């Protein structure tokens, strides 16, 4: 099969450039790109992100590679240009110079720009110089408290994407300029670009003009060096090892540099890499939520989701099903539900039970948007396009960044929906009316009156969620006509990308807070199990000692109370009474006493005889219990605090363990209590920083390492 690269100059005929007869509208290519699971796609992204070299040829750049170059500013990931692209780039550059010599009238080469393209000039180089000058209209706010500079990671992403676009040989620019930008990237020299001022149609004119300004040595151009030092253009060139000196732009070259969507699509690529990771994390968090809530795993049953047909939902359910399959928490919950089916509602609430249905559409939106942006960063998106094969310049509008604006608006909606689910789950988790026995606010102190746990975190989560939902409002509905009504519709791609980057940051705050809360809940379930065991053993011990025999050693009717007394211990939530286990106002002692009362009522005539009265045993039982139980509870608590619990933590038997282990052991977070000095925010910061550094990825994928990509069989 013939392949076509670089404007028809290698390995292909002119005819094959025109129409792909097998897939003339490229829908087939788009559909093919969506095959396979989302998780597999995320794994491929991670592999791409970690490659030490990004080789650019114009057509195979991935969003993960863009994110990698953007995020690795220490020189450990390098950019290489494919030499096979050089002939095509040179041919289009030569064509522009030849057409200029012949007097051919071409937009941006011999004409003015935009609404003033009726003007004409033969001074092609001077025209490009003026283009860069008037586009340097950004504001940096130097000396003010507010920063108006684009983050250097986003600038690096833009530089990479612009090189990739120009390598395809349709733009009329010298290969040497692309090599110079590559040198800047590889030496971590980053031009300073304004944060605002682009509508991403005609591309990102204003910010990209500052890259061109640095290349041409404009006196107002600035860059940051490897350690954050501010450099002028000459210092930047020296630091990057560019020995050729500043570029005198030839006709069309200034336009080639600025008339593209690279800033918007570069930032969109960074955003989407993180969004895809956070989408998988949300599936894991939902599964762990089911574990600590004693949820019913049937919500993941494949038949339910197969009948709904949506692939995102099917995959989300299958991933949760895999995590919950064989989970020690699910086994314990199943036993609990079988023993006492009325202890909790028949069905879990929507935030748990419908989490696959909620997350599925968001994952589909994120996947589609990822592919859309990946097409954009491999597109030729300036104007005019130089078609050497037909000896003409084609005037069109590929600079219109609508795929960016629309994709980012849609992704922001998906992010807001994921955040809303996490907030709903978090709200259930910290509320003792809904969390199936966990303490209010997930408090872990001996004295709950001096520990309010995650109350502050819940307020913060409400704040995050509110801001996230506000950010979900579309940017693309706020288009203003620009540039003398020439740019009367425009994409606002970079603005939408920036808002989506904000949304991603907030979702990371929410994911961090929720993950730490889930680890707190896991530890509380562990503590709960050990405390309940201590209570149960003590009640059993006291029952045998006090209730088995009467005053004369004869068997006493109250001995039959023990079974029901132990059932009370099983049924009562430990954290509802454990701070003062023998208090008559707490449910444990009240329910234990009720057992005696019920048996006394059934004891008939024997109850009238002091020696066989069940009721008469209440005082002795309670006095013995009050003497022993507080000590046993404290002993169990002390053993837990010292890491010597009688019962091990169930999480170690679960597929979600790698994530818990990462948070607790690698990051060194602890069980939060009012008895310790650590604030919740200190622990959140540890996890948030690790999440921003990408350290969450490996433990997250380790949780899913055994998944074969399919739901469990329906049987």
UniProtKB/Swiss-Prot annotation:
Pfam families: Lyase_aromatic
Residues bound to (E)-cinnamate: 259, 347, 353, 383, 455, 483, 486
Known catalytic reactions: L-phenylalanine = (E)-cinnamate + NH4(+)
Gene3D superfamilies associated with the record: Fumarase/aspartase (Central domain), Fumarase/aspartase (N-terminal domain), Phenylalanine ammonia-lyase 1, domain 3
Cross-link (5-imidazolinone (Ala-Gly)): 201-203
Protein's cellular compartments: Cytoplasm
Pathway annotation from the record: Phenylpropanoid metabolism; trans-cinnamate biosynthesis; trans-cinnamate from L-phenylalanine: step 1/1
Family: Belongs to the PAL/histidase family.
PANTHER family xref list: HISTIDINE AMMONIA-LYASE (PTHR10362)
Stated name of the protein: Phenylalanine ammonia-lyase
Gene that this sequence comes from: PAL
